[in-house]
Amino acid sequence: MGIKYLLRDKMVVRSWRHIKERYCLIGVRCKNCGTVYFPSREICPKCRRKTEFEEIKLSGKGKVYTYSVVHVAPKDFEKQAPYVIAIIELEEGARITGQIVDCKPEDVYIGMQVEAVFRRIKEDGDDGVITYGYKFKPIEN
């Protein structure tokens, strides 16, 4: 049983369980077919079965696969609008959703080379906890 069992049974706060994905871009590679996924999972959709995975540190570099400009933002993000949310295809093959920063929405395009950066996501209330995580910025050529 022990601590590992408690962690698997989600007895700890959710934010602690997702530290590797949120702050380090740690993904997994299926040992059977080699497909890379982010965030981690227990079943490989390609193999269609439960299999073994190995953790891998993702480079954070990739290209914009598709994107959308958000003009009417949800609560806590109103001040950022308009902003771009994109699906990024990482060099390792995994696709990840993230905000594009450090450029105007009209400058974003499909195929644009980007890299992950660690940024402020939001703040809970006036005196609340600041949440940080990854976003993506264009790679200057």
Curated annotation (Swiss-Prot):
Entry-linked InterPro entries: ChsH2_C (IPR002878), ChsH2_Znr (IPR022002), NA-bd_OB-fold (IPR012340), Thioester_dehydratase-like (IPR052513)
Highest taxon of source: Archaea
GO molecular function (one): metal ion binding
Binding site for Zn(2+): 30, 33, 44, 47
Record-linked Gene3D superfamilies: 6.10.30.10
Alphabetically ordered keywords of this record: Metal-binding, Zinc
Any Pfam family: zf-ChsH2
Subunit record text: Interacts with acetoacetyl-CoA thiolase and HMG-CoA synthase (HMGCS) that catalyzes the first and second step in the mevalonate pathway, respectively.
Family, similarity comment: Belongs to the scaffold protein DUF35 family.
Function: Functions as a scaffold to connect the acetoacetyl-CoA thiolase and HMG-CoA synthase (HMGCS) dimers in the channeling thiolase/HMGCS complex, which allows for efficient coupling of the endergonic thiolase reaction with the exergonic HMGCS reaction.
Name of the protein in question: DUF35 domain-containing scaffold protein
Source species of the chain: Methanocaldococcus jannaschii (strain ATCC 43067 / DSM 2661 / JAL-1 / JCM 10045 / NBRC 100440) (Methanococcus jannaschii)
